[in-house]
């Protein structure tokens, strides 16, 4: 349910994450799916997902009709292999979903280097993809609220971010989740 305290939480978490907008949902999975739908991702599109993750990360892409391409982990690491991720980007790739395992943010510098380097392959569908002009970075930050990388808090590291407030997470409302996003040029945060 929502009410004035939910709106207050959204406002305070947006400020905490250094983003203009954050909305609460019933789960991180719902937030992840919403992020992909806002991006216009669907049938015929590919979403890159690390092989080492909870099923909900891939399920969100499947729910919108996209094809999931799993990326193996780096040797001796739980993070996805960023070189393999870069090689997997094709003209059908619309998003990569890095997973901030155990509250440790991924190497977003390397992820952005990869998606920027493959911009020429990107075929946008819709206003949001057009505004990005490249593969979207849609973070699964279910365990990462409160973490930061190079002084940038989770929520502001990726284009779109999902958080979980499940009972076992570091910030909990017993259930629930949220979606945060960075402001995109030419798009209204309130309309998104």
What does each model-found stretch correspond to?
Residues 11, 109, 152:
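Active-site phosphate/pyrophosphate- and oxyanion-stabilizing loops and adjacent acidic/basic residues
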């Amino acid at each position: 349910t929502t009410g004035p305290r939910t709106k207050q939480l959204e406002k305070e978490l947006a400020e905490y994450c250094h983003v203009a907008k954050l909305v609460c949902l019933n789960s991180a999975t719902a937030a992840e799916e919403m992020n992909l739908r806002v991006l216009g991702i669907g049938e015929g599109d590919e979403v890159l997902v690390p092989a080492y993750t909870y099923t909900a990360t891939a399920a969100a892409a499947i729910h919108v009709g996209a094809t999931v391409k799993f990326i193996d982990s780096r040797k001796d690491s739980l993070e996805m292999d960023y070189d393999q991720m870069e090689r997997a980007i094709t003209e059908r790739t619309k998003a990569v979903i890095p997973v901030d395992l155990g509250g440790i943010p991924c190497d977003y510098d390397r992820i952005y280097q990869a998606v920027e380097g493959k911009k020429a392959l990107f075929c946008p569908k819709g206003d949001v993809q057009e505004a990005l002009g490249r593969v979207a970075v849609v973070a699964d930050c279910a365990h990462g609220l409160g973490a930061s990388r190079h002084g940038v808090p989770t929520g502001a590291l990726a284009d779109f971010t999902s958080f979980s407030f499940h009972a076992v997470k570091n910030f909990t409302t017993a259930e629930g989740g949220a979606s945060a996003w960075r402001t995109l040029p030419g798009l209204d945060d309130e309309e998104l």
